[in-house]
């Protein structure tokens, strides 16, 4: 009887470990150790392409998918210092000084256009993480992205998020990030759908 109980405990413990491990992979970078410090250079890219299976967070199910026509309005927030240098959901390192973001369902990595509807400022970000899982927020931005959209101090803003295309795994942003400030975006929008230019 004692041997049976011991084996039962081992089996249950093993199953619990597997379950927790699979669940933790869906949470954001806070679950991973910090590899790079606040002032360290963080390498770009190096992750893997990921869409993912349906997953549950706090009792709510999310269904990752490729959605080339994604165009949504909602609340954006940002995450910074504490998460800097930790692995993101697709195996890249979060860099608060880069233009990146987290989204609950879109493929990783991808390029998104984010427009702050409170001041009409727009940028392109590299999507490489999952989240946010708070209220009606639809995107979590890096600290740098929040600065460029002038929402850092406020913490949140009403934004429009539009999918552009899949991003390269090597982290080479090319023309997307070389001149991300207002004015350069016209070149990008000509190569995308008319929905992206209808602001």
Indicate residue ranges for each PLM-predicted region.
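Sec-dependent bacterial lipoprotein signal peptides
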Residues: 1-21
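Secreted/periplasmic proteins
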Residues: 23-199
């Amino acid at each position: 009887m004692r041997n049976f109980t011991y084996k039962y405990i081992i089996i249950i413990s093993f199953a619990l470990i597997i379950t927790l491990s699979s669940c933790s992979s869906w949470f954001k970078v806070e679950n991973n150790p910090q590899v790079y410090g606040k002032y360290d250079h963080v390498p770009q890219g190096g992750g893997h392409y990921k869409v993912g299976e349906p997953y549950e967070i706090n009792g709510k199910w999310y269904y990752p998918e490729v959605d080339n026509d994604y165009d949504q309005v909602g609340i954006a927030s940002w995450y910074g210092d504490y998460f800097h240098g930790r692995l993101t959901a697709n195996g890249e390192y979060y860099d608060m000084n880069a233009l990146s973001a987290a989204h609950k369902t879109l493929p990783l990595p991808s390029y998104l256009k984010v427009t702050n509807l409170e001041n009409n400022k727009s940028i392109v970000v590299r999507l490489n993480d999952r989240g946010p899982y708070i209220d009606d927020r639809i995107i979590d931005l890096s600290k740098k992205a929040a600065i460029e959209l002038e929402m850092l101090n406020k913490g949140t803003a009403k934004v429009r998020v539009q999918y552009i295309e899949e991003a390269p795994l090597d982290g080479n942003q090319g023309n997307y990030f070389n001149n991300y400030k207002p004015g350069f975006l016209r070149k990008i929008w000509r190569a995308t759908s008319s929905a992206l230019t209808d602001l």
